[in-house]
Amino acid sequence: MTRGAWMCRQYDDGLKIWLAAPRENEKPFIDSERAQKWRLSLASLLFFTVLLSDHLWFCAEAKLTRTRDKEHHQQQQQQQQQQQQQQQQQQQQQQRQQQRQRQQQRQRQQEPSWPALLASMGESSPAAQAHRLLSASSSPTLPPSPGGGGGSKGNRGKNNRSRALFLGNSAKPVWRLETCYPQGASSGQCFTVESADAVCARNWSRGAAAGEEQSSRGSRPTPLWNLSDFYLSFCNSYTLWELFSGLSSPSTLNCSLDVVLTEGGEMTTCRQCIEAYQDYDHHAQEKYEEFESVLHKYLQSDEYSVKSCPEDCKIVYKAWLCSQYFEVTQFNCRKTIPCKQYCLEVQTRCPFILPDNDEVIYGGLSSFICTGLYETFLTNDEPECCDIRSEEQTAPRPKGTVDRRDSCPRTSLTVSSATRLCPGRLKLCVLVLILLHTVLTASAAQNSTGLGLGGLPTLEDNSTRED
């Protein structure tokens, strides 16, 4: 009993010694592991704060630059609006002055003058001739209508003045454009086709050959209209000369130059041809308005590209659309390119508009894709159009208008790069942080397992030694 009790005490003492020894040996391991974990957590926290601060600073700088660009763009728009208002006021003042001058001229013509009395009496004096020259110079430079002949001499000046905005007896005016297309009208006068009857009633010119024939005969050439002076309303880079010479059969009609230039020819054919051209022009305008509505609906921001903007996209899309409706060669161009190349310009300048469908994913595909360009080789029969890039760079600024070639909001490189790099930079930082955390945890786990396995044999050795 005594030996058994002593053995039990010895067992208890040995048990106490066996339990207490690993606790004393375990404290330094626990402290080192805790210190290592604290170091890892502090390192990861420091790394994350550095990356986050860099990200926030970069995005804040991009936001500041974006706001500056917007303010600058708004200031430019306000300045353009002020300039437009000033120009409108100047135009109104000029119109008022012209109206006053016309009224004064009418009053002077109504009042009897000595040269007019002498001319009515049959006497041709130098004063009468000078008065005729002055009255003729005050009339517009537009050529007269062939149907406007007849009547007294006093009514001819009024008819000529009325033709400044109206052709013939039509109620629809043929507005004169502010500037001609680059190297466009030969006479320097550009008009928009509005009334087919008024246009077909003109005495058309056959070109320089007719003028040489008349000069050789000794007769004075009568002022004639030129087909290259009349443009369409929407596709305003196409003249009637180009349409009649290239698109001679719109809607199964015979619209050749011989039909139009024939003196005393049928006006019905000419009117039908011009109306067919106007229908094509209206259809092109409707398609362009649909494209504008799509851009306005789906394009969230104008800053979709560094080199292009919506205005550039609309310009090339309009040129491509008109070239599809009017497959003719343009003559009045500084530089020509194949009309099919307009499609590539639209594809490169217009934005990518993805469909509103989450199930279908389009990876890097444009909403406007050119097809059929490389199936057939370009031949000499392909129509050629004006190069928009050279025309935009060298086109003169119209009078009374604001220069809109730089109207696209050009953002700085920091803004465009920040909008693309901020989300990607954040994802990269998070990925690096996760990889660093996994590597450190794996190394810590290996160290803890190595220490644990190294301590077990020492405990067994102690127990065997005590036995």
Swiss-Prot record:
Disulfide-bond pairs as recorded: 200-270, 235-322, 255-270, 313-350, 333-386, 339-385, 343-370
Signal sequence span per UniProt? none
Annotated Basic and acidic residues bias: 390-408
* This protein's UniProt keywords: Cell membrane, Disulfide bond, Glycoprotein, Membrane, Transmembrane, Transmembrane helix
Query: Which InterPro entries does the entry mention?
Result: NALCN_aux_factor_1/2
Cited SUPFAM superfamilies: beta-sandwich domain of Sec23/24
Where are the stretches annotated Disordered?
Answer: 121-161, 390-409
Where in or outside the cell it occurs: the entry states: Cell membrane
Q: Which GO terms describe its cellular component?
A: plasma membrane
Q: How does it sit in the membrane?
A: Multi-pass membrane protein
PANTHER family to which the protein is assigned, alphabetical: NALCN CHANNEL AUXILIARY FACTOR 1, TRANSMEMBRANE PROTEIN FAM155
Whom does it interact with, and what assembly results? Answer: Component of the NALCN channel complex. NALCN complex consists of NALCN and auxiliary subunits, UNC79, UNC80 and NACL1. These auxiliary subunits are essential for the NALCN channel function.
Q: Which family does it belong to?
A: Belongs to the NALF family.
What is the name of the protein in this document? Answer: NALCN channel auxiliary factor 1
What is the native source organism of this protein? Mus musculus
Lineage start: Eukaryota, Metazoa, Chordata, Craniata, Vertebrata
